[in-house]
Amino acid sequence: MRLFVGLGNPGSKYQDNRHNIGFMVIDEIARRHGFSPWRRRFQGETADGSLDGERITLLKPLTYMNESGRAVQEAVSFYKIGHGEVAVFHDEIELPPAKLRVKVGGGIAGHNGLRSISAHIGNDYLRVRLGVGHPGVKELVHGHVLGDFAKSERPWVAALAEAVADNAGLIAKGREATFANKVHLALQARGFLDDDNKKSGADKAAK
């Protein structure tokens, strides 16, 4: 059994924010794989299903980003799972738009959702880092992540969510490197990532 956690803030005010890309990806996994209807549990919403034969619970904390760890800890305690069975999907400003990185443990890079989760369950969980780009200067970061995706960004956001959902079973099987590679190739095939693996289609459109 694995717990997939998508990070974001609850409510319509925040639903299109860059900070909510974790919610968007988790919603897409639920849609594409026929998970159960969402229900209120663990200070959040959960949906149950399976990926490649592995039982999965999806969790969207409704505590607001800064308290996400409370919901995660409740779920981990209820299911009696180790940190290695937890995967957290979150926005990452240090990655270009449409880029993805997967890693276990490490720092929190100023992300308040990760800070809360690490404070509650420790650092040894999988992070699926979803690139949303950096505004260029530190002072603009807050407004950037709490700002909505522009209309021009929505195609790559949808493509990234679809690629993650299509390949999420690889995470359930512990094949994180293959997962990351397949997502990259899917985004590249649709023109949102350059062949040099450095720039996104969103970057090119902005020039």
UniProtKB/Swiss-Prot annotation:
GO terms for biological process: protein quality control for misfolded or incompletely synthesized proteins; rescue of stalled ribosome. It is found in: Cytoplasm. One of its GO terms (cellular component) is cytoplasm. Its EC number is 3.1.1.29. It comes from the Bacteria. The record marks D91 as: Stabilizes the basic form of H active site to accept a proton. The active site is at H19. GO terms for molecular function: peptidyl-tRNA hydrolase activity; tRNA binding. The record marks N9 as: Discriminates between blocked and unblocked aminoacyl-tRNA. TRNA binds at Y14, Y64, N66, N112. It catalyses: an N-acyl-L-alpha-aminoacyl-tRNA + H2O = an N-acyl-L-amino acid + a tRNA + H(+). Pfam families: Pept_tRNA_hydro. The keyword Cell wall biogenesis/degradation does not apply. Monomer. Hydrolyzes ribosome-free peptidyl-tRNAs (with 1 or more amino acids incorporated), which drop off the ribosome during protein synthesis, or as a result of ribosome stalling. Catalyzes the release of premature peptidyl moieties from peptidyl-tRNA molecules trapped in stalled 50S ribosomal subunits, and thus maintains levels of free tRNAs and 50S ribosomes. Belongs to the PTH family. This is Peptidyl-tRNA hydrolase.
